[in-house]
Amino acid sequence: MFKWLGKLLGDPNAKVVKKMQPTLDEINALEPKMKALSDEQLREKTAELRTRFAELTKADREALDDRYADENRHDSTVEKDYQKELRVIEDAALDELLPEAFALVREASSRVIGQRHYDVQMIGGIVLHEGRIAEMKTGEGKTLVASLPLFLNAIAGRGAHLITVNDYLAKVGGGWMGPIFHSLGMSTGYIAHDYSAIYDPNYIDPNAKQDDSRLVHWRPCSRREAYMADMTYGTNNEYGFDYLRDNMVQHKDQCVQRELHYAIVDEVDNILIDEARTPLIISGPAQESSDNYRRFSSLVRGLKRSSISPDEVRKGLKDDFDGDYWIDEKSRSITLTESGLEVMEKRLNLPDGENMYDAKNFELTHYLENALKAEYVFHRDVDYVVQNGEVVIVDEFTGRTMPGRRWSDGLHQAVEAKEAVEVRRENVTLATITFQNYFRMYNKLGGMTGTAITEAEEFSKIYNLEVVIIPTNRQVVREDYRDHIYASQKAKYNAVLREIKEMHEVGRPVLVGTTSVESSEIVSNLLKQEGLEHYLLNAKQHEREAYIVAQAGRTGAITIATNMAGRGTDILLGGNPDGLIEEHLKALGTTITDATPEQLAQAQAQAKADVEAERKAVMEAGGLHIIGTERHEARRIDNQLRGRAGRQGDPGSSRFFISLEDELMTRFGRIDTIKRLMERMSDGDEELPLESGLLDKAIESAQTRVEGYNFDVRKHVVEYDDVVNKQREVIYADRHAILGGEDMGDRILEMVVDEIDIHVEEFLDNRELDKPDLEGFLRQLYSIVPQLKAQETELAARFKGKQADEIGEIATEVVEEAYNRLGEELATQYTTLLQRGVQPIPGVSGPEAFFAHFERQEMLGAIDREWIDYLTAVDELRQGIGNVAIAQQDPLVAFKREAFKMFDELKGNIQNRIVYNFFTDAANWQVRLRQVELEMEARLALAQTAGGSENATEDAPKPAKRGVGGAARRVSNAAGQAAPARRIVIKIGRNDPCPCDSGKKFKACHGLPGKEAELEAILAVKHTHAQAVGKK
């Protein structure tokens, strides 16, 4: 019925593509004109396009700025509205420039890298520019397609980001497109973990693989510089973490990202759907890890799993469970049965009358639940691997290891205890965001993938992104065979082995896709027993990933890969000549770095000839054959695996092998129904495969159920995270306003005055009191401004006989005087130090700048400390909110209500922290600055006493000599006395963080020549402060 309806209404996707034909015709008509231009004229075209863009947007932009002139742009809602209107203005101008810009990039690409964009690639570029998702089959050139909208949107001068799934793909993609952009006068940046670079054709990276021109021209630069490039390539993790780090900095110049203007997400389904449930978290150490993790890991061993489900007990089909615990495979949760609970209570030696879930044992249940999950739900070589004594999570969708990622809420510690590796201390969340909310902050977002249409509903509902299927340049001729279905995994793996051998014997390359490390090693061991050479690519070995995948199309090659989704490297029939050059050079007795130009040319020609000969042989044999060892939870990941074969019109085929013992079938399949079908169709031979449309539908139905379940979970995550996301936007917008503000004094004074007004009402104008409590009011006033205690007698006289409102006015006046006096005193002290050649705070060069810096630090410190506490509290609220369902309340509604109440408390806590700390911390700074003065005077006196220059003045002392491989800095503890004092020696490694808290390494900051005196002053301040804290 639906197919008939589709024919009647027409294919909406075809209509979208057809609408782009006039634009495509315009682009093609410009091709002869572009070909006639010289290289220099092509480059000049970029500047011309930028000028035209500025002219096209000028009037509307000025009108927009005028309308928002009186608005608070630091308000996240106002800024969003502004950016929406600005996007309409800019997109209208870019749409007008699109044909010329695309034609320009096409011509530059043809000249620089020898690749001309096909018409279908132009259509893909238009889709991406419009902020949609382009579904493009494997081998259709997504990297090249992205160059078109990246260039066009970079014309606006606000940056354009290309986001990929791993560092290698980002580096290769940027290095391949970099020459195109460079020829057109645009810069390309690259960000990775602890590394950032700019594409520079005149720079050669000595550490890069020299035979790959895409990797050698990355010149290291600051992260800020990489983001300021016209286009920036990087991974989703790096962009997200940089955003979080930017919202934790203490100085504006420490921010690295600019506005989130335009982004293209490669493998968009992987990043925005598969990883949507995994939040990015920056955490810091909390308390030391508890011994209870090891204790409970030992206690939970040896429990028996129940084969009876709660449904069977609830429906009366079974009397009781037959084990100690049962597992809900769908939600991956584990629950103790009554017998299991009794076992655990005995093992814990709980007193009679006590049980695990008594309030006093609440903490123990946390360890118990995590230990049970670690022991029985999370499996080694499936959910994680152990590498170098560490538990490393394996991405369930891509099969990649995720170093640095840790499960939260103690689960990671429980797994570490299970594996008998070091149990690391637990963490507290400092900042967090989900990919869903990070990418929704971009003004415009596009995406590319080979498989998106099955998730079109989710892309539309959560990200407001439409999926458009881009036609292939050549027709796909791959043959997708029906699934082979078996009752047992043993029979299935035997069939997989037979099929691999059959394909190998006729010279066809085979790619075996598995869903876990465990299953990939099962296949690998079967092949070893048969003596068949093969490559194994899983979470344990991905260093040579790109090379292995690139050569997977060679004659008779056998490659086993865990979840091919997102691998990002094309499998070329016959192999990739680039990867064979080193082999031929080795045969010539040389290497890539030592080869002569003649040897290099000979190796390249030989590799190309070998590949071409193999390509013909492989194509005649039938091309690449794909084997899936089981169906994935999502149909699109199956499609991604299939899509590795049959690229750009090449021959190929695919088949999936399934058993009823596969995880998908046990968790989501209706096993009883499928078993009955199989019994009717089989003759009892387990080794005989079954092919049936009914069975195929049953399996597809299981996949549809799991897709629906996972969509609901992700929607659930985003609904909850949206609450915190709005609050995060408010907090981060406030931080940005503070970082960019020159003077926060008025705002701080306003907070102080508000607090005084509260206490006026509480102590002086409170009808519940018998009489005004002036003493109580003064206590609060002195706790806010301790400096006023010195004026106690004078203030008592001024307040005597006054009404509440008059006292409030006098108190406000007195506080403002104290504030101004404090600013003047700190300014005088800071000026004195500057005159003596010491700058206690790097980058703060004047007395006014110092006081403004101090005010900002007070406000940022209050926000950050309270926000960290709030994140912990709101996470605990979220974990426990499910209990309200018992009281028949909607958990989401209850969570929103409580979270908004907590957020109001957070704002009040921030204000209180600023109000009650500001004057106290300022007084401490006065003490610290005076201490630095005394330290300097003591060192000067010491130098004179020790026979220094007779003409010694109050200039800064000579710098201490630097040691080899590090530095020793001596800080006197003389505290103003001229006599020799005990010295404190602080050793700082060249690569250690600089003690000035700039975030830079020591060697690049105060380890530079001429910075010694300044460093001594900083260390003196820190030392004095540490002493002061100790005394408190």
Swiss-Prot record:
Entry keywords, A to Z: ATP-binding, Cell membrane, Cytoplasm, Membrane, Metal-binding, Nucleotide-binding, Protein transport, Translocase, Translocation, Transport, Zinc
In this UniProt entry, which cysteines form S-S bonds? Answer: none
Q: What is its EC number?
A: 7.4.2.8
Q: How is the cofactor bound?
A: May bind 1 zinc ion per subunit.
Q: Which NCBIfam families does the annotation name?
A: PRK12904.1 (NF009538), secA (TIGR00963)
Quaternary assembly: Monomer and homodimer. Part of the essential Sec protein translocation apparatus which comprises SecA, SecYEG and auxiliary proteins SecDF. Other proteins may also be involved.
What name is this protein filed under? Protein translocase subunit SecA
Q: Report the source organism.
A: Herpetosiphon aurantiacus (strain ATCC 23779 / DSM 785 / 114-95)
